[in-house]
């Protein structure tokens, strides 16, 4: 089974933190790779229009953000940029072979 999970976090390098699954705000499930990729491609293209900015990081994973969408970090006593990423999972394991979507 394929899953596309949207995470919301105040950091972009989600793969550096073991608790990234705690940041999931939406999930979409698919039976086939083709169905998942059709949805994922559409989601990335729509997100490029919706968000002010994006970065393409490790494993071709996009991190989207809007200017001035900040969250206060109590531990560091400052406002941090909020990022949104879509993580693809295959049978609950992160799938790292994503194509670059232009």
Place the predicted regions along the sequence by residue:
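A short, exposed loop/beta-hairpin motif centered on an aromatic-Gly-Thr core
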Residues: 21-38
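Intrinsic disorder/low-structure terminal segments
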Residues: 16, 29, 38, 71, ...
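Short aromatic-glycine-(Arg/Gly/Cys) micro-motifs in beta-strand/loop hairpins
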Residues: 1-25
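Conserved long hydrophobic alpha-helices within structured protein cores
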Residues: 1-6, 36-43
């Amino acid at each position: 089974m394929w899953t596309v999970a949207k995470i919301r976090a105040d950091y972009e390098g989600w793969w550096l933190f073991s608790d990234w699954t705690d940041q999931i705000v939406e999930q979409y499930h698919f039976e086939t790779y083709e169905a998942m990729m059709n949805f994922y491609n559409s989601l990335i293209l729509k997100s490029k229009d919706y968000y002010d900015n994006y970065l393409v990081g490790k494993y071709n994973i996009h991190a989207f953000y809007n200017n001035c969408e900040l969250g206060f970090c109590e531990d560091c006593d400052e406002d941090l940029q909020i990022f949104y990423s879509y993580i693809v999972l295959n049978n609950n394991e992160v799938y790292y072979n994503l194509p670059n979507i232009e």
